[in-house]
Amino acid sequence: MVTVLIAGGGTGGHVFPMIAVGDAVRAAARDEEARVVYVGTARGIEVRVMGERGDNLELLHVLPLRGGGLSGFVRGAARAGSVLPEARRLVERLDARVALSLGGYAGGPVSLAARSLGVPVAILEPNSVLGLSNRLLAPIVDRAYVAFPETARALRPSTVRLFGVPLRRAFARAPYAPREGALRLLVLGGSQGALALNDVVPRAIARGRERGADLEVVHQTGRDREAAVRALYAELGLAGRARVVPFIDDVAEALAAADVVIARAGASTLAELCAVGRPSILIPYPFAADNHQLRNAQSLERASAAVAIAQGDATELRLADEIARLAAAPALRARMADAAAAFATRDAAARVAADLLELARAPRHRALRFPTLGGRAARAGEAQRGAVTNQAAPLGAGLGWEEAG
């Protein structure tokens, strides 16, 4: 049996590509039995999504280094000293043959642990800019699966595979035919919703209708925000025109039914709307790491597949203008849909899966010891696992490793 570890999670932008690759690995293995084990944290949506699917999910006890201020950083850094040995025990127990990281809080520790044991390591970066975890892992990986050509410039050429964003099999091209009746809008703020979209989009739709546009909307609000958004639509006189839901389980079906999508610009969301082939108005999340959502959105805008509006410029008036313009221009919407579909890579999951299985069958590397961690937490981890060492030589982007004898 070949065991493939797929680590990441936290948001739908990680979880759904993880699922897509895992499903493709099992399909590609054919006569060779393949076990897919996902690794995430208790803080992410993977617990619910993968739990409902009955997937094999392991959880690491990881604290974030970003977003918690100085105290949060200190707690997360201290915890890192014990997370690496925890991840190493996990890799050993499962006898993993290859590890794939999508970044995030689980991806880094699992990849470092796998590499320390000689297990081949791959990263998958769906965004146009490498995330922090993948950027740090880049010097030690065997493969780097990317979706944007510009991402490759930050990676060793021999490792790069330009495969696109892995998607679940449900996402397929849906013919785009402008039709009579109301323009159907789909609002996606990501798996956790988007406060800014929850406020400005209903107001923009109300203004668009004042200008004569016939509009209907399905609005994904994120959990715990449904009631407030539903109340806002009612206040604006749109209760009969809006279907408000906290989370859309079948996004592929919702995209196929939409005429225009209003969304953030996470890579998975963009890959999904391109696979189905839908025009979009994109409002990138301005606080995404390295502002990667803005670059994602600009890539689609350059391809004439989307309208990109920075959040600071996304007033209800500006958004109403764009909605009304697209509502009045069915030919433009059709051209944008074709451009989006041309941007899609529908076989990414299968290509990643085939390559991962090839890595899994390859001979293992020579084992490496953990990088220097420093501090009390690292010394505690060293006491737990003799493999942890503070004697290390620098490699690449600050990662220190020592070959095990």
UniProtKB/Swiss-Prot annotation:
Binding positions (UDP-N-acetyl-alpha-D-glucosamine): T11, G12, G13, N127, R168, S191, I248, Q293
Cell compartment(s), UniProt: Cell inner membrane
InterPro entries: GlcNAc_MurG (IPR006009), Glyco_trans_28_C (IPR007235), GlycoTrans_28_N (IPR004276)
Catalytic function, reaction form: di-trans,octa-cis-undecaprenyl diphospho-N-acetyl-alpha-D-muramoyl-L-alanyl-D-glutamyl-meso-2,6-diaminopimeloyl-D-alanyl-D-alanine + UDP-N-acetyl-alpha-D-glucosamine = di-trans,octa-cis-undecaprenyl diphospho-[N-acetyl-alpha-D-glucosaminyl-(1->4)]-N-acetyl-alpha-D-muramoyl-L-alanyl-D-glutamyl-meso-2,6-diaminopimeloyl-D-alanyl-D-alanine + UDP + H(+)
Pathway: Cell wall biogenesis; peptidoglycan biosynthesis
Enzyme Commission code: 2.4.1.227
Membrane topology category: Peripheral membrane protein
Enzyme class: transferase
Pfam families for the chain: Glyco_tran_28_C, Glyco_transf_28
GO BP terms, alphabetized: carbohydrate metabolic process; cell division; cell wall organization; lipid glycosylation; peptidoglycan biosynthetic process; regulation of cell shape
Keywords from the named record: Cell cycle, Cell division, Cell inner membrane, Cell membrane, Cell shape, Cell wall biogenesis/degradation, Glycosyltransferase, Membrane, Peptidoglycan synthesis, Transferase
Gene Ontology, cellular component aspect: plasma membrane
GO molecular function, one term: UDP-N-acetyl-D-glucosamine:N-acetylmuramoyl-L-alanyl-D-glutamyl-meso-2,6-diaminopimelyl-D-alanyl-D-alanine-diphosphoundecaprenol 4-beta-N-acetylglucosaminlytransferase activity
Chief location: membrane
HAMAP family named among the record's database cross-references: MurG (MF_00033)
Similarity comment: family membership: Belongs to the glycosyltransferase 28 family. MurG subfamily.
Physiological role: Cell wall formation. Catalyzes the transfer of a GlcNAc subunit on undecaprenyl-pyrophosphoryl-MurNAc-pentapeptide (lipid intermediate I) to form undecaprenyl-pyrophosphoryl-MurNAc-(pentapeptide)GlcNAc (lipid intermediate II).
Protein name according to UniProt: UDP-N-acetylglucosamine--N-acetylmuramyl-(pentapeptide) pyrophosphoryl-undecaprenol N-acetylglucosamine transferase
Native species: Sorangium cellulosum (strain So ce56)
